[in-house]
From Swiss-Prot:
Residues bound to Mg(2+): D83, E152
Name of the protein: CTP synthase
Keywords: ATP-binding, Glutamine amidotransferase, Ligase, Magnesium, Metal-binding, Nucleotide-binding, Pyrimidine biosynthesis
Domain Glutamine amidotransferase type-1 span(s) in chain numbering: 303-552
Function of the protein: Catalyzes the ATP-dependent amination of UTP to CTP with either L-glutamine or ammonia as the source of nitrogen. Regulates intracellular CTP levels through interactions with the four ribonucleotide triphosphates.
Gene: pyrG
Length: 553
C-alpha cells in the first residue's frame, strides 16, 4: 500500500494518474490508460480506472450508436462509455458507475444542490462549485485498498467542454501534492509523406496549450505510424520540458493487446512507479504472454459474421467483437469478423449470399424495427442449414419470433416493440416498462440494467458451456419473452434453457444438440463479462462450433 507520513503516523493515499490527449481525437487514450493500468496491476499494484466525458448527456444510454458507439453496462447497471469496457477487459476487474462521469451528471448534481439550498445562498459558479463536484467524482473510488486511480479525460486539450475537468485535475494535484499525482499526455507525431519527415510541432503546441491551463505533463506517449528515433524523442523532451525517460513512443500495433508490451519496452510503467514512489515489483507476464501467443500464433482460422444494423460504425459492437476474438483465443483460432448488414438477409437468397463462407453468426442487441426482418432471415438460414448461431438480447427475441413464425406456424408473431397492437406478441413489454414505453417517464436509465442471476436447465448446452446451473449476466432491455407463449415454444421444440430464479423471465433459449449443433441465445449481454485472458464460455463455445462446422464442410 502507498502511505503518506504525518509525524509518526502513516495515512494511505490513493494516487492519481490523469491521461489527456492532444492534437486529434481517437489517438487511443483509453487503450493507453488501460495498458498502463494492466502493467501496474501486473506489478502487484491495485489499480482502478475512470473516464470523464465532457458531453452534457447524463450518460450515453439514449445516444445514437452511430454517434457514440457502444453503450457499456457495468455490474451495477450504469450505462457508460465504451472505454470502460477496455478498462475492465485489460485489468480484469468489475468497475462501477463511479468509473464514468459526464458533464451532464456534474451539472445535474450541482443544480440539485442549489435548489436544495446546500450552497447557502452562494452564487454558484464553474469555479469552485462545478470543479469541486468534479473533484469529488475523481476521488470517489479512493480507498485504503486502492493504490492508484487512472483517470482518462475525454476529448482533446483545447476543447472548451473539457476545461472544467482539466482545472479540477490541476486542483487535485495541488490538493494531493505532486508526489501523489501524475499527468500523462497522449499526442500525435504525424509523418508528412511529401517532406519524408515526422513532425514534432503539433505535440509542442498541444503541450503549450496544456500549460496554459496550469498543467505540465510528467510523461508523453507519442503516437505514430512508424518508430521515432532518439533524436526526435530528445527534441520533444527539450521543447516540452519533460524528462527524457518520460517520453515514450507507442507505434501502431497489429493488435490492441500488443500495447502493454510496447509501453513496457519503452519504460513507461517503470517511470510511473518511480515518479509516484510506488512499490517496485517485476511485471508478471505469464498471463499476458500466453494471450499474445494465442493472438499472434493461432492454429486455426474461422469466419464469423455479425449481422447487425449499426455495422457502419464497428464501435457500436465493440464488446461483441472483442468477445468473439477472445472466443477464438480460447480455441487457438484467429476469427475473421465479417460485417453483414441485417437488411441483406431479409430473403432466403439474400441470407445465403451474405452468409456464404462463414462458419457462425452472431445476432447482437439493438433497438427499433429497422433490420429486424434481416435478423430473422439470418436466423432462419442458420437454423435450417445448421450454421452455428448466437443471439444476444434482441438476438434472443429475434430467435423466438423466427421460431414462432416458421416452426410453430404463428405467421403474425411479433414483438410489441415493433407492432404494439399485434395479435401474437411472443415478445412483450416488461410490466415495469409499460409506462416508460407509453411516454409517461424518462427514457434514460430506466431499462432493466445491470447484473441479474439466472438458473440454467440441467443437461442443456448452456449449462454445459458454463459448467454450472447458476450464472449471472448483465442486461439492458425493456422487452421479454411473453410468458403466455412459453409452453407453446417448449412443446414446439425450442428449449427454454435458462430462466430468472422466479421462473418468470426467459434468459436463455436453445435448440437441442441432436437438432442443431449450436443454436443458442440469451436475453443478456455476456460480451460485457468476456476478457481476452478469460473468454466467455458462450463465445468460446460458438467459435468451437464454428470450427467444427468448418471441418465438416
Amino acid at each position: 500500500m502507498v502511505r503518506r507520513t504525518h509525524g509518526n503516523s502513516q495515512e494511505h493515499v490513493t494516487k492519481h494518474i490523469f491521461v489527456t490527449g492532444g492534437v486529434v481525437s481517437s489517438l487511443g487514450k483509453g487503450l493507453t490508460a488501460s495498458s498502463l493500468g494492466r502493467l501496474l496491476r501486473s506489478r502487484g499494484i491495485h489499480v482502478l480506472q475512470q473516464k470523464l466525458d465532457p458531453y452534457i448527456n447524463v450518460d450515453p444510454g439514449t445516444m445514437n450508436p452511430f454517434q457514440h458507439g457502444e453503450v457499456y453496462v457495468t455490474e451495477d447497471g450504469a450505462e457508460t462509455d465504451l472505454d470502460i469496457g477496455h478498462y475492465e477487459r485489460f485489468l480484469d476487474v468489475f468497475l462501477s458507475q463511479k468509473a464514468n462521469v459526464t458533464t451532464g451528471q456534474i451539472y445535474q448534481e450541482v443544480l440539485r444542490k442549489e435548489r436544495a439550498g446546500e450552497y447557502l445562498g452562494q452564487c454558484v459558479q464553474v469555479i469552485p462549485h462545478i470543479t469541486n463536484e468534479i473533484k469529488s467524482r475523481m476521488r470517489a473510488q479512493a480507498s485504503d485498498d486502492v493504490d492508484v486511480i487512472i483517470t482518462e479525460i475525454g476529448g482533446t486539450v483545447g476543447d472548451i467542454e473539457s476545461q472544467p475537468f482539466l482545472e479540477a485535475a490541476r486542483e487535485v494535484r495541488r490538493d494531493l501534492g505532486p508526489d501523489n499525482c501524475m499527468f500523462v499526455h497522449v499526442s500525435l507525431v504525424p509523418y508528412i509523406s511529401a517532406a519524408h519527415e515526422l513532425k514534432t510541432k503539433p505535440t509542442q503546441h498541444s503541450v503549450m496549450m496544456l500549460r496554459q491551463l496550469g498543467i505540465s505533463p510528467d510523461a508523453l506517449v507519442l503516437r505514430s505510424d512508424r518508430p521515432l528515433n532518439q533524436s526526435i524523442k530528445d527534441k520533444i523532451s527539450l521543447m516540452c520540458d519533460v524528462d527524457a525517460e518520460g517520453v515514450v513512443n507507442c507505434v501502431d500495433a497489429p493488435s490492441i493487446y500488443d500495447v502493454p508490451k510496447i509501453l513496457f519496452e519503452e519504460g513507461l510503467d517503470a517511470y510511473v512507479v518511480r515518479e509516484l514512489g510506488l512499490p517496485f515489483h517485476d511485471v508478471d507476464w505469464d498471463e499476458w504472454a500466453d494471450l499474445l501467443e494465442r493472438v499472434h500464433h493461432p492454429k486455426h482460422e474461422v469466419n464469423i459474421a455479425i449481422v447487425g444494423k449499426y455495422i457502419d460504425l464497428p464501435d457500436a459492437y465493440l464488446s461483441v467483437t472483442e468477445a468473439i476474438k477472445a472466443g477464438g483465443f480460447a480455441n487457438w483460432a484467429k476469427v475473421n469478423v465479417k460485417w453483414v448488414a441485417a437488411d441483406r438477409c431479409e430473403t432466403t437468397e439474400g441470407a445465403a449470399a451474405a452468409l456464404d463462407n462463414v462458419d457462425g453468426i452472431v445476432i447482437p442487441g439493438g433497438f427499433g424495427i429497422r433490420g429486424i426482418d434481416g435478423k430473422i432471415g439470418a436466423l432462419k438460414f442458420a437454423r435450417e442449414t445448421k450454421l452455428p448461431a448466437l443471439g444476444l438480447c434482441l438476438g434472443l427475441q429475434s430467435m423466438v419470433i423466427e421460431y414462432s413464425r416458421h416452426v410453430l406456424g404463428i405467421e403474425d408473431a411479433n414483438s410489441s416493440e415493433f407492432e404494439p397492437d399485434c395479435a401474437n406478441p411472443v415478445i412483450a413489454t416488461m410490466e415495469e416498462q409499460k409506462d416508460i414505453v407509453a411516454g409517461k417517464g424518462d427514457m434514460g436509465h430506466t431499462m432493466r440494467l445491470g447484473s441479474y442471476p439466472a438458473e440454467l436447465e440441467e443437461g442443456s448446452l448452456v449449462a454445459e458451456l458454463y459448467g454450472t446451473t447458476h450464472v449471472t449476466e448483465r442486461h439492458r432491455h425493456r422487452y421479454e419473452v411473453n410468458v403466455a407463449y412459453k409452453d407453446r415454444l417448449r412443446e414446439g421444440g425450442l428449449r427454454i434453457s435458462g430462466q430468472s430464479p422466479d421462473g418468470e423471465l426467459t434468459e436463455f433459449v436453445e435448440l437441442p444438440q441432436d437438432v442443431h449443433p449450436f443454436y443458442v441465445a440469451t436475453q443478456a449481454h455476456p460480451e460485457f463479462k468476456s476478457r481476452p485472458t478469460k473468454p466467455h464460455p458462450l463465445f468460446a463455445g460458438l467459435v468451437k462450433a464454428a470450427l467444427d462446422h468448418q471441418a465438416a464442410r
